[in-house]
Amino acid sequence: MEQFNNFLILLDSFLSGSWWFPALLIGTGIFFTVYLGFPQFKYFTSAWKIVSGNYDKSESSGETTPFQALTTAMSGAVGTGNIGGVALAIWTGGPAAIFWMWITAIFGMTTKFVEVTLAHKYRTTIEDGSISGGPMYYIEQGLNMKWVAILFSLLMMITAIGSGNMPQINNIALVMNTEFAVPKLFTGLFLGGLLWIIIIGGIQRIASVASKIIPIMGIIYFGGALIILIENHQNVIPS
């Protein structure tokens, strides 16, 4: 385990400790932003209509509505990195870190736009009639690099088990144990069973649950941030 941790530390220093990695991420976003004519601004109205549910029609193709697809994507994006990561960035880099997060977010929108477009272009319908897609499909079909698609899939499975689940479940179990004396094992088993019930229902059940939970989570998230800003209003302008 110690050797594995040392490998992860080495890999992290290679990726996050070097200039080329953020330059590659931001550079990709800048390239597609210019190439596609600033789609994050050009299609802002359409994006707002999707969020508002204007395109949620039962006769539309696909297994989920656009709003359900959005909330499902957000359920996997908003979490440890967006909450703890932002706090760590501000603590480490100061208030100026917020500005650079805004910049990367603006160009990151275009990168996400391209990713989703490719996922739709190369998605396939499997035997049971359900739709399957994602980076592994457009890597294999678009780039004709099957081995990279397989490697990507394996790494994503490891990520889903590791950083995708363990830190969140561990933090919840720790809080429940510290504040309410609930055994960690009980919390883990309860959450595991709850997630199993949702996941076993496929993408439609996942999307249905996400579309109901994520808006509430968003309200709590922004409400908490607003309360913090109000309580520390004297530091807003100096920051």
Q: Where are each of the predicted segments found?
A:
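Hydrophobic, membrane-embedded alpha-helices of multi-pass small-molecule transporters
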Residues: 21-32, 65-83, 148-169, 183-192, ...
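N-terminal alpha-helical transmembrane segments of multi-pass membrane transport
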Residues: 1-80, 91-96, 108, 230
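Alpha-helical membrane segments and immediately flanking helix-loop junctions
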Residues: 59-92, 118-136, 140, 157
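Membrane helical hairpin/interfacial module
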Residues: 86-87, 93-107, 114-115
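Interfacial helix-loop-helix linkers and transmembrane-helix boundary segments
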Residues: 61-64, 89, 95, 202-213, ...
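Membrane-spanning helices that line or support transport/gating and their immediate boundary helices
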Residues: 43, 47, 109-121, 205, ...
